[in-house]
């Protein structure tokens, strides 16, 4: 399959690029910074903010994996985050439709629900939560994710291209996820707070990459977004205890046994059948 990958040297993109190449796909990868490029991958350095650069890319491909964006908000560049992430995504989506690309897979985020970066402490209305959880935006990163999802809807209406958005949690390497869990275990105050705000969710980048492979192998149509997380948490205590302590106002819809995730990914599993396999080893980490 001929694939265009944006954000190729970022955290998720690096693993996706490696996984796509290993699976035998013909990959053209682009990003604003250099990185380690697997054999057989064509890498093009450039900025998606530059219209001339975007126009120079070959969009005559079977699929696009769009991961190119500023990955989190900062107060001193709130507008820059929104402008970059929305305009670059619009360009890629429009080019996909114009070139009859079969499917576009793009990175959305669980931060779309508003808890991750909100200044006031914010809790989900209910848990486990599926994609129907109301969205509450407090900064431009969460807002741009919703705008991008609606942009995908529009282009799906106007073309035969399918758009699949993945609402990723904290997505990182095995080592970084382990360190995050250990810091919570050891009571590191900042990490404990951050983990509670992101609802203790995580996904290993290897699972992110194989989830994307599952989409590319499928027969997607229209525009859809999915929660996509590991089935457990990084928390040092059972989920019901963590909810009671940090999110006591959240309505618990059903029992969440043990260290089960607050995120309901059943729609994702039903659509593509991929279950994350790179899970934290609690015995190893002593949690």
Placement of each model-derived feature along the sequence:
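N-terminal Rossmann NAD(P)H-binding glycine-rich loop of SDR-like oxidoreductase domains
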Residues: 3-23
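Catalytic helix-loop patch of NAD(P)-dependent Rossmann-fold dehydrogenases
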Residues: 83, 119-162
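Short alpha-helix in the Rossmann-fold core of NAD(P)-dependent oxidoreductases
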Residues: 82-89, 93, 105-111, 144, ...
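NAD(P)H-binding glycine-rich loop region in Rossmannoid oxidoreductase-like domains
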Residues: 45-84, 95
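Conserved Rossmann-fold NAD(P)-dependent oxidoreductase catalytic core, especially the SDR/UDP-sugar
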Residues: 91-138
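C-terminal substrate-binding subdomain of Rossmann-fold SDR/epimerase-dehydratase oxidoreductases
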Residues: 206-287
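Alpha-helical substrate-binding/gating segment
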Residues: 174, 179-193, 198-225
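Flexible, glycine-rich beta-alpha linker
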Residues: 113-114, 140, 158-182
